[in-house]
Curated annotation (Swiss-Prot):
It holds the Pfam family EFG_IV. The keyword Metal-binding does not apply. Belongs to the TRAFAC class translation factor GTPase superfamily. Classic translation factor GTPase family. EF-G/EF-2 subfamily. GO terms for cellular component: cytoplasm. It comes from Bordetella bronchiseptica (strain ATCC BAA-588 / NCTC 13252 / RB50). InterPro entries: EFG_II (IPR041095), EFG_III (IPR009022), EFG_III/V (IPR035647), EFG_IV (IPR047872), EFG_V (IPR035649), EFG_V-like (IPR000640), EFTu-like_2 (IPR004161), G_TR_CS (IPR031157). SUPFAM superfamilies: EF-G C-terminal domain-like, P-loop containing nucleoside triphosphate hydrolases, Ribosomal protein S5 domain 2-like, Translation proteins. GO terms for biological process: ribosome disassembly. Catalyzes the GTP-dependent ribosomal translocation step during translation elongation. During this step, the ribosome changes from the pre-translocational (PRE) to the post-translocational (POST) state as the newly formed A-site-bound peptidyl-tRNA and P-site-bound deacylated tRNA move to the P and E sites, respectively. Catalyzes the coordinated movement of the two tRNA molecules, the mRNA and conformational changes in the ribosome. This is Elongation factor G 2. GTP binds at residues 17-24, 88-92, 142-145.
Length: 707
């Protein structure tokens, strides 16, 4: 089987947006116009093709990023066939891990904005993630038919808030109820879509006279941006010669691919206007796998190597999503960066040092699947039959090993105890939780050693709620869930030296002897734990030094204040002694543990609590109530601004997570259900003394017993 589409005609794109900007509807229209779905799925009827998990349909929000393949020949049928792989990404803050994960494997993104709401809190998070992975993007201002729609305001917000160089390549014809179509600034023609054919047919018309001056003004700005792509275009532009349509497009393309500009389009996906032209813009301006730099990884000796997006290079791919499918079991979604792989081939997972046989390879369309025999560089597909794999692992040709950069995942900030209702549920729950943790690296499962309870941790209340819900639906596990618990941390504030730990047992026969002297220092936030060996003259033999490190590491899990994990400390092994016969690894491990506990007590230990960045959008009448309530939750209000279009106020604050439980219910009653909020983890901060004392007292007996 040979390649159906050359790699230059591939587009791997993500569609990202703030919740409710109409992203799922936009994706639906793409599937419709590219000829895959024949009835348009509407989100508000719970029937969208991409939202394929039951909870998504009920909640009307997209949770799992499904990958879909579509083909496009241009809205006027004037392009060779292009293959567009779309990764649908969630717009809810609790699911940013999904967005981060898909950004890693995309070549380009289409950012969808609501014409009224504009740039919203989640849009900023998604933008930062796209910057982190260097993903070129175009912007689509959706819902132009809404009351208060303002395309140019969104353009200003992208420039001011996101610091993106937003370049309109279209302007709207009308707005709100009178939104009819767009002016294509490259062709200088109006595009009007036909309602009767659900937007499949369209016609070019002359620009309405009242828009002519505005169109010329924005076209001039666009041409200036395009001309800056290279010397030849700039020279031609500066000498006053007109640039051709192809020259404008190639200039805009070069600057978009280089992440210098963001072409902007508009439309109303719901009213079947604009999505078709946005698909053309994906082809015109977003990169193919061949336009982005080669992927860099490391070989087994940790030397840097690269792979180019070509079929004749050795096979390399990244597993970016793992899902359990009710029909075929575990599905591993992967992006092929180089080479070709056939079903039945063996590939190596170098991070697990394990060879895996690819059973079947499936190409997905939402939750429909087509079996294919091989995949090529640039493809996105799903494999069945891979046993041991975690999100972010590399799959590679066993004869030419490469380890691609691992993704980084945030630490969970909220925990809950979860208990099976019956004995039968108990066994199923273990299997279900392990499956879910394998699919979602921001979800953790552990057993509390004291209480024996199973503790689940995640990125927010909604995140855990949905995972418990999935346990019930997909695995038939009925479980009771405890009150959410905050993931506190402990650290130290001062340096202590000469902290001694001695573990000696000599009672006939072979004894135990380990003796260490440690120095403890606070590290800057986020630096984590660091161990330094400063032993001179072999007073502690080489072979016992890893045991000292291990002893400290094990003790980090339970701090001395309230038994929470310890972060951001530097431990230096400065001195010690040993016994020729009685010393062993275990003795040094115990000595290090004793020394660390003692040192921590002396180093001014403090309790840290997670602080959340909270944004509340509220009608103006309730602003005082909202701010007062946030302050009563120990929140620091950091700013307030008008929501464009007379839509009330946006209040930004930093609030401890411990004070935010059940906030959605309180906010509803404070504002008669008219305010919305979003929240994401910001950083850890020292808890005030009286708060810390309460937490320590509540955990006191346990911590005292542990100490």
């Amino acid at each position: 089987m040979t390649r159906r589409t050359s790699i230059e005609r591939y587009r791997n794109i993500g569609i990202s947006a703030h919740i409710d900007a109409g992203k799922t509807t936009t994706t639906e229209r793409i599937l419709f116009y590219t000829g895959i779905t024949h009835k348009l799925g509407e989100v508000h009827e719970g029937a969208a093709t991409m939202d394929w998990m039951e909870q998504e349909q009920e909640r009307g929000i997209t949770i799992t990023s499904a990958a879909t393949t579509a083909f496009w020949r241009g809205m006027a049928g004037n392009y060779p066939e292009h293959r567009i792989n779309i990764i649908d990404t969630p717009g809810h803050v609790d699911f940013t891990i999904e967005v981060e994960r898909s950004m890693r494997v995309l070549d380009g993104a289409c950012m969808v904005y609501d014409s009224v709401g504009g740039v919203q809190p989640q849009s900023e998070t998604v933008w930062r993630q796209a910057n982190k992975y260097g993903v070129p993007r175009i912007a689509f201002v959706n819902k132009m038919d809404r009351v208060g729609a303002d395309f140019f305001r969104v353009q200003r917000q992208i420039v001011e808030r996101l610091k993106g160089d937003a370049v309109p390549i279209q302007i709207p014809v009308g707005a709100e109820d009178h939104f009819e179509g767009v002016v294509d600034l490259v062709k200088m023609k109006a595009i009007i879509w036909d309602d009767a054919s659900q937007g499949v047919r369209f016609e070019y018309r002359d620009i309405p006279p009242e828009l002519q001056a505005q169109a010329e003004q924005w076209r001039e700005k666009m041409i200036e941006k395009a001309a800056e792509a290279n010397e030849a275009l700039l020279e031609k532009y500066l000498s006053g010669q007109p640039l051709s349509e192809d020259e404008i497009k190639s200039g805009l393309r070069a600057r978009t691919v280089a992440n210098e500009i963001v072409p902007m389009l508009c439309g109303s996906a719901f009213k079947n206007k604009g999505v078709q032209a946005m698909l053309d813009a994906v082809i015109d301006y977003l990169p193919s796998p061949a336009d982005v730099p080669a992927i860099i990884g490391h070989d087994e000796r940790d030397r840097e190597i690269e792979r180019h997006p070509a079929d004749d290079e050795p096979f390399s791919a990244l597993a970016f999503k793992i899902m359990t499918d009710p029909f075929v079991g575990q599905l591993v979604f992967f992006r092929v960066y180089s080479g070709v792989v056939k079903s039945g081939d063996s590939v190596l997972n170098p991070l697990k040092s394990k060879k895996e046989r690819l059973g079947r390879i499936l190409q997905m369309h939402a939750n429909e699947r087509r079996e294919i025999s091989e995949v090529y560089a640039g493809d996105i597909a799903a494999a069945v039959g891979i046993k041991e794999i975690t999100t972010g692992d590399t799959l590679t040709d066993p004869a030419h090993v490469i380890i691609l950069e691992r993704m980084t995942f945030p630490e969970p900030v909220i925990s809950q105890a979860v208990e099976p209702r019956t004995k039968a549920d108990q066994e199923k729950m273990g299997i279900a939780l392990n499956r879910l943790a394998q699919e979602d690296p921001s979800f953790r499962v552990r057993t509390d050693e004291e209480s024996g309870q199973t503790i689940i941790s995640g990125m927010g209340e909604l995140h855990l709620e949905i995972l418990v819900d999935r346990m019930k639906r997909e695995f038939g596990v009925e479980a009771n869930v405890g009150k959410p618990q905050v993931a506190y941390r402990e650290t130290i504030r001062s340096t202590v030296t000469d902290v001694e730990g001695k573990f000696v047992k000599q009672s006939g026969g072979r004894g135990q002897y380990g003796h260490v002297v440690l120095k403890l220092e606070p590290q800057e936030q986020g630096k984590g734990y660091e161990f330094v060996d400063a032993i001179k003259g072999g007073v502690v033999p080489r072979e016992f030094i890893p045991a000292v490190d291990r002893g400290v590491r094990e003790t980090l899990n339970t701090g001395v204040l309230a038994g929470y994990p310890v972060v951001d400390v530097k431990v230096t092994l400065v001195f010690g002694s040993y016994h020729d016969v009685d010393s062993n690894e275990n003795a040094f491990r115990m000595a290090a543990s004793m020394a660390f506990k003692e040192g921590m007590r002396r180093a001014k230990p403090v309790l840290l609590e997670p602080m959340m960045h909270v944004e509340v959008e509220t009608p103006e009448d309730f602003t005082g109530n909202v701010m007062g309530d946030l302050s009563s939750r120990r929140g620091m209000v950091q700013g307030m601004e008008d929501i464009a279009g007379g839509g009330g106020k946006l209040v930004r604050a930093e609030v401890p997570l411990a004070e935010m439980f059940g906030y959605s219910t309180s906010l509803r009653s404070l504002t008669q259900g008219r305010a919305t909020y979003s929240m994401e983890f910001k950083h850890y901060a020292e808890a005030p003394r009286q708060v810390a004392e309460q937490i320590i007292a509540a955990r006191g007996s346990g911590a005292a017993a542990r100490g």
